[in-house]
Amino acid sequence: MVYYPQMTSRPLRLLAHLYAMQKASREMSGGILHYAAIHPDVRVQLYGIGTPRHRREEFRVWKPDGIILGAADEATLRAVEGLGCRAAVFVNTEPAVPAAMRYGSVYCDNIAVADAAARVFSGKHLGNFAFVGTRTCDAWSVERGSAFRRLAAASGCSFSEFKSPPTASANLRRELAALVDWVGALPKPCGIFAACDARAKDVLDACAAAQVLIPEQAMVIGVDDEEFICRQTLPTLSSVVPDFSRGGYIAAEMLVELLTGNRRRLPRRTFGVQGVVERMSTSDTRGTGRMVSRAQEFIRTYATSSDISVEDVAKASGSSLRLLQKNFKAVTGSTICDAIQTARLSKVCKLLSETLTPIGQIGELSGFGNNAYLKKLFHRRFGCTMRNYRANH
C-alpha cells in the first residue's frame, strides 16, 4: 500500500519542455512523470516544441515553479524567466549566458555509452575500432569519440576517426563522398561506432556505396535505439540504449531539490545505459568476422617470431584452411600469405627506423629466414634499399 502524506501547501509545479519527436525526450518525459506519480506534492505539465501560442499563455497563468529543458540559449533562458520559473534543470547542456535562476544539469554518461559499444566489438574479437561523430561536432559526440578512442587503446586495438571535410556544412554530397572513401579504406574487419542512430544510418549507406559487407567486414552500432531508424535500415541497426527514463527521474529530483533547498547551483549528474539492442548490423551469424579476427590476431602475435604457415593460421582461427582463405580474402581484401608478409615487413621497418640493429640481423628478427629474399622483397615493396630506408627515417 502506498502512503500519500497530507499536503499542507500548494504542490510544486514542474514544466517539462522537451522535444517529443525524439525517443530520448519521450522517455525522459516518462521518467519525469514517474517521479511525479510517486511524489504527490509535485505536478507536471509537458510543453513540447511547436506548442501553440495560446497553450504557452496557459502555462504562464499556471505559474510553474521550475522547468526541465533541453535548450540553453539566451532567448530560451529569457522566455523561461518570463514564465516565472524559479529554477531550471538543463538536459545535456549548460546555460549559454549567466542565469538568474537556480539551476543544475543532467547528462547522459557518454563514457558508459562508448564502453557499451566497445564491449560489443570486443566480444566479437574485433581488433579495429572506428568512430563517426556528428557533422556539427556536438560536445556529447566529441566526448563519446574520445572515450571510444581510449577504450580502443586500452584493448590494444587500432583506431580511426572520420573527420568531416571543412566544407561539409555547405556541401553534404562532398561530406558523404568522403565518408564512403573512409569506410572503404578502413582495416577489415572493424567495428564502427556512430555517435547517434541518424549518423549510423549514414555509415550504413556509405558502406553500401563502398561495397563494404555488413556485418562480415564492418559491424556498426548507433546510439538511442530510435526504432523508426534502426528497424528500417538494411541491414537493421544495432544501438546502445541510454537510460533516458532514469535521466528524466533524476532531472525531476534535482529540480525539486533546487526549489526546496538552499543551493543555487547543483553539480552535474549523469544517467547511464540500459544495454545494447543487437540487430543485423552486428550479428555475424556465420562467424566470418570473428574467424578472420582470430586469424589476424595470431598473425600479429607470431608472424615475426616464428616460421608460421597458412595451415597454422587456419588452425588458430578454428576453421578449415579452404574456408578461412575464402573468408579472409572477402573480409580483408588480401590473402593470408600477404597478411603474414605485411606483418613481417612492418617489423622490418620498425627495426630500421627505431633501432640500430645491424641490417644483416633484421631478417631473422622479423620472421624472414632468407636475407637475400627479404632485400629483394623490400626493394620491390618500398622502392629503396633497407639501408636507404634507415637513412631517410
Q: Model-derived features: where do they sit?
A:
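Bacterial carbohydrate/catabolite-sensing allosteric modules
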Residues: 1-68, 76-316, 321, 325, ...
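A secondary-structure capping/hinge motif
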Residues: 328-335, 376-389
